[in-house]
């Protein structure tokens, strides 16, 4: 499934936050903690049984993580799509297909 992540969703997210005056709480440290906490909450569904999990709950937590990532990029005054593309460019150099295809090794072990 293709992901159509664009400025419309980022704007909607910021408006939601700003309408509630929550931006005052969105420091890089608080947002970093929130991202970690929300991603940790998705792990609960996989504890003890990785095959039978509540997909709806996992998707809710994934959405929460993405929302906080949008807020973090706004707080740091960076373009989220641009930093994702920059990171992918770095990953392509660290993990060339011919060296890592089918491998779970870290780039330092390739």
Residue ranges of model-derived segments:
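Flexible "arm" and connector segments at domain edges
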Residues: 1-62, 66-110
